[in-house]
Amino acid sequence: MSNPQIPTKMKLLFGELDITPRVEERLEELGYTVADLQEAAIKHKSDCDGQPSVYVGTYGKYNDGSLCGLWIDLSTFNDFDDFIDFCKAIHADEEDPELMAQDFEGFPRQWYNEGFMSENDFDNIIEYSELCDKYSQEAVDDYMEFHDELDDFEEAYCGEWDSEEDFARHIVSECYDLEKSMGELANYFDYEAFGRELFMWDYSMGANGNVFRRV
């Protein structure tokens, strides 16, 4: 007789997980009870409002014409193995689910991978999310125009300016005393040309006006 406290089905986004005795065994192998999985699904389900998210189904279900799966908020995980175990748990009706990332949202396209993400990509996405929270998504996206990883973002990030010339004026005001070195000729200093030279060799500016030192 089935336990009356355990639901016989768990709703996902498109479809349901049938809670059979074998499914309960697989969940236990992954460190879940049915109640644990219900709570985890609430915690990890993405609202698709900008957070880094992936829709996780399986190749087996997809080949059978089913889109059963769940939008998962990656920022709710700190550990790649925990993420994988949760994905396997929501597909515990398969003996050995081959996970399939069917859609993506909220992180750069270079980490989209239908064949499912690697641990390195997962770590990059979590770092991306944390940097977006600390700085801004526009700043991090600008950096990603020039780089594939985020290791040097904080060392490289200078701030946001309206133009290369504005940034050149900032550099001059911070680093030089033109009036002392040039006298009245300081009024004729070509900030536009100086800005072009800075961004030719030492700096980059993204589409949103964020500036990065080349490190």
Language-model-detected regions and their locations in the chain:
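N-terminal ordered "arm"
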Residues: 25, 35, 42-91
